[in-house]
Amino acid sequence: MPINLYSKAVFLKSAARVNQLPEDSGYEVAFAGRSNAGKSSALNCLTNNKNLARTSKTPGRTQLINLFSLDEQRRLVDLPGYGYAKVAMEVKLEWQKNLAHYLEARQCLRGLILLMDVRHPLKDLDQILVNWALHRELPVHILLTKADKLSRSEVKNAVLKVRQYYELAEHLVSVQAFSSVKKDGVEELISVLDRWYEWN
């Protein structure tokens, strides 16, 4: 599949709850991560569109489930960022409930791209999200973002650490380094997405 197919992503809709999402059919791949993990930047990098997902200096800005259409059957899903301290507790709990509901109930979900800051991987909520996915045998591809902030050896060690942590689930969990700034890791991410979307 040509790399530029992801650049055809267009905004489809926003949903506050799972029951507001489009019909549960086709293929969806969800992007999730802590509020400061660089999720919007990664989506913009993948699609080569700096305006696709709104980036903000204020973590926790994405409070809705945002869907982007690749074609009639395939969608990218930007899930609300989680774990930001300045968000009210009831809002946090609502987000987490929506995340859990989406991951457990959405039958067209083919995989989860989970973003973690390479300097601070494996936070509690990250692990909870992976466990939710593994509970329903959903593949997870972990992007260790902001790899440009560390040396190559530090990045390599971080990737190894996360791989070892999930080695018992290696049939479902894969890990790579990623930098939106340098566009490092984009092709590896695309190869995972291509497989999940079953592009012919």
UniProtKB/Swiss-Prot annotation:
Keywords: Cell cycle, Cell division, GTP-binding, Magnesium, Metal-binding, Nucleotide-binding, Septation
Ranges for domain EngB-type G: 25-199
Sequence positions that bind GTP: 33-40, 60-64, 78-81, 145-148, 178-180
PROSITE patterns: G_ENGB
GO cellular component terms given for this protein: cytosol
GO biological process: division septum assembly
Source organism: Legionella pneumophila (strain Lens)
Name used for this protein in its record: Probable GTP-binding protein EngB
Function, as annotated: Necessary for normal cell division and for the maintenance of normal septation.
Cofactor(s) the protein requires to work: Mg(2+)
Family affiliation: Belongs to the TRAFAC class TrmE-Era-EngA-EngB-Septin-like GTPase superfamily. EngB GTPase family.
Annotated Mg(2+) binding sites: 40, 62
CDD domains: YihA_EngB (cd01876)
InterPro entries (UniProt xref): G_ENGB_dom, GTP-bd, GTP-bd_ribosome_bio_YsxC, P-loop_NTPase
MF term (GO), any: metal ion binding
